[in-house]
Every structure is written in structure tokens, then in C-alpha cells.
Amino acid sequence: MLLKLLAGLTAAVVAAAPAAGASDRELAAGERVFRSQCMGCHSVEPERNRAGPTLHGLFGRISGTLEGFDYSEAMRTAAVEWTPETLDAFLERPEAVVPGTKMVFWGLRPNDRRGVIAYLEVAAQ
């Protein structure tokens, strides 16, 4: 019983920990970039779509599969699995990763991408 409790507590601590290697400063910077560049169209709250889909539970999801959001045909057929690496490429040049995406976005600089991804790894769980 005690082992199960300890295993559960360990899992909870690991899940709540910041993204590997992300400092508090990087997380705060990522949140600022998210709020200024992403939040107009995206939320990190469950079931809270805006002009873009919610990013809650993004990592591990396949592009274009969130129920209740009207994705472009390009996003549905791209079948990109969202990982920190694929999101980094997408946030650099969305059209290069998903040609025909209806997301109008010019891309982010490398430091901003790292910060946003670190923030989403924590906030969008």
C-alpha cells in the first residue's frame, strides 16, 4: 500500500515539474510570448476552442483530431504528432510543416519558440 502511495506521489511530482531544463525565467518568458502571440486564437483550457483549437493536451495528439474544432483539410491530412520537436518546427514556419494550414502566423524566433514550448509543456497538460 505504501509503495503504491509513494509511486503515485512520485508520478504527481514528475507531472507537475517544469519541462526538462526549463528555468522559471524561461517559463515566464514563454508565458509572456504565449499571451502576446498565441492567446488571441488559442487557449490552454480544456474544451475551450477559440479561432484556433485549445492547446490543452497538445503533446501526443495528432494534428486535426481534436473533436469540436473545424480544422483545415491540410491540418487533418498532415497527421503530425505534436511533440516539442514538431511544435518547434511548426512555430518556426507553419506552412513548411503543414502546407495549406489556415493558421495565419509568421513564426517565432528560436528563444521564443523554446519558451512557448516549455510553457505549454506545463500549462497545457
Walk through the language-model features, giving the residues of each:
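Bacterial N-terminal signal peptides
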Residues: 4-16
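Generic alpha-helical structural context detector
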Residues: 11, 56-60, 89, 118
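Electrostatic cytochrome c docking/interface patches
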Residues: 16-35, 44
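Gly/Gly-Pro-rich "capping" loops immediately C-terminal to redox-active cysteine motifs
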Residues: 27, 31, 43-84, 102-107
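Sec-exported extracytoplasmic/periplasmic mature domains
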Residues: 35, 39, 46, 60, ...
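Hydrophobic packing within well-folded, soluble alpha/beta domains
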Residues: 38-41, 116
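C-terminal capping alpha-helices of c-type cytochrome domains
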Residues: 83-125
